[in-house]
């Protein structure tokens, strides 16, 4: 609404009051005209560009005391006691050539502490200029402690006793030996360096996963800890550059060989059955703008954004992760189900008994290829308007009532319509189709499968358990920082997701040794056991790990933790004690 100014001002400068520019000033003049000068609400509102209702609302707020037009200034303190107390010392140190950082550090140890901002203000007030950058030797002490170099552990020079924050990390060694980690590394063909064996490299990276270090670049949190180094058979862990560049020496084929050997060991240890396997994709978001990365749908952001697409497989019976791949692209992602089936056939000599996955994982053409190979699948069918309408048109007698099991020992009553010869658009044969209502959705859930032997109830309950793989991925994010992208190069992420599978398998094996923890999640194991501190006692020919007393120490005393021989310790024995 246009603003109508009052008559021309009597004196110069009066236009400031006739045509106020600021919102608060305009509101003040409008209220003054209405409340003091006696203009009607309509006249005052028109003069200053308000609607009548807006002006009356402003008047109501003013009368209620909710409008302050003139704020009294509140001057701040005229002196800075802390600066004044430290001024003489700051001037003395600055004249001696010390930097602002060094002066602040020195004052922090005195009775007149002052932060860097205060020191900088004093230097500016006293006319001191900026110091040129000086050689490190002239700038005072080092900012960070020099960490020990990574090398193979020399047990002859190790101290007789050392304190560690992660003594609990060594609880994972018996299960790593049961899986025969050195043989897995050899099967993968992972390279060694002049100083560090391949097994120690992998154990160094695994240690970060098991204790919940979010990124490889945070390795310095553990780099000087003797427990973490001993876990890997080293005098000290490799540092950031060595660990982050190790993946550049690898290729996807090596990860496949490692997973094949790991899956064999997992099956032999009874950690998986391989009969029914859940499959799913997971996009790991990239926070930069790398144009080389494709855009994928990221559930956490509810949008498509640049990310690295990963693929996981989980044993449906034991919930152990079996497979991971980050070497994917949009053009090839639909074929990943077949790639996993071939991997499993190569590893075990047979195809999986049943593959369970979401409708977005693959295409109908790939489903036909699975059927050609005799691989059974169970997946969702997308609901089209035509299909939904046809289901709504079915008579009540076409639906069969069933009671299906739910998590936690509960049950649910559902209605099912089964079509044993349903047709798909791009699938050359018929499939068995189950339309299910009563699962908490507005529209029927439609399952399709080429399995004509399992009962309807068994198929519905089996697909309901597919959500377990999403729980495993949530555990990997929470415990192993799966969503902390290892880099913009998928090759880096490929090794990282394989390490997450290995860490998950180790935790699955460890919890079997702990009474009452058969279903514990990895983050629970980390918090209660793997993060336990303690002491490492070197007896020359064997090592004793004495774990500190904690609330959960009784569980460890009852656990199956045998004395074992560790190959990467020069075949020395490992023995556990509890304080």
Regions found by a protein language model. Name each.
Residues 15-22, 27, 135-303, 310-330, ...:
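Dynamic "connector" segments at or just before major functional cores
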Residues 46-57, 108-121, 194-195, 224-242:
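Short, basic interhelical loop/turn and adjoining N-cap
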Residues 23-39, 85-98, 202-210:
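Short, amphipathic alpha-helical "recognition" segments used to contact nucleic acids or chromatin
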Residues 149, 155, 368, 373-478, ...:
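An anionic, glycine-rich sequence signature occurring as long contiguous blocks
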Residues 3-27, 72-85, 190-197:
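Short, Lys/Arg-enriched anionic-surface-contact patches
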Residues 41-42, 46-47, 51-92, 117, ...:
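Short, basic alpha-helical/linker "hinge" immediately adjacent to a nucleic-acid-recognition surface
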Residues 219, 455-490, 495, 499, ...:
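Short amphipathic alpha-helical "interface-anchor" segments enriched in bulky aromatics
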Residues 80-113:
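A short, amphipathic alpha-helix used for macromolecular contacts
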